[in-house]
A protein has these predicted regions:
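Gly-Asp-aromatic-enriched flexible segments
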Residues: 1-110
Length: 110
């Protein structure tokens, strides 16, 4: 999905479950409370398994969770990802992920 950067837009997790690590169980968009992502994750410092977004291939990742405001002033493709170990530094990385989330993007603000 392309975002224009001028309007207030927010992403809302409408359902589903996923996991960055099958041993820790399935979660929604907020991820695993108490499991904080380390360096090398999509967004270090946020919950492991949380819904993360970025705008464009070189955009800075931002937390969406169950509901999050998209940053204004950025144009490009909205990309979504689970907050996981991208390089397999701490485990299997993205290869053991399971599940999916349904996400709606709409105009509005938090």
């Amino acid at each position: 999905m392309q975002v224009n950067g001028y309007s207030w837009q927010l992403a809302v997790c409408r359902g589903g479950q996923w996991t960055a690590n099958p041993a820790t169980g399935m979660v929604g968009g907020d991820g695993h409370a108490g499991l904080i992502a380390k360096p090398g994750y999509t967004l270090p410092g946020a919950n492991e398994g949380a819904l993360i977004g970025r705008i464009g291939s070189n955009g800075t990742p931002f937390l969406i969770g169950a509901m999050g405001q998209l940053p204004r002033g950025q144009q490009g493709e909205l990309q979504l990802c689970i907050n996981d170990d991208l390089d397999g530094r701490y485990g299997a990385g993205l290869s053991d992920n399971q599940g999916s989330l349904s996400v709606e993007v709409r105009f509005g603000s938090l």
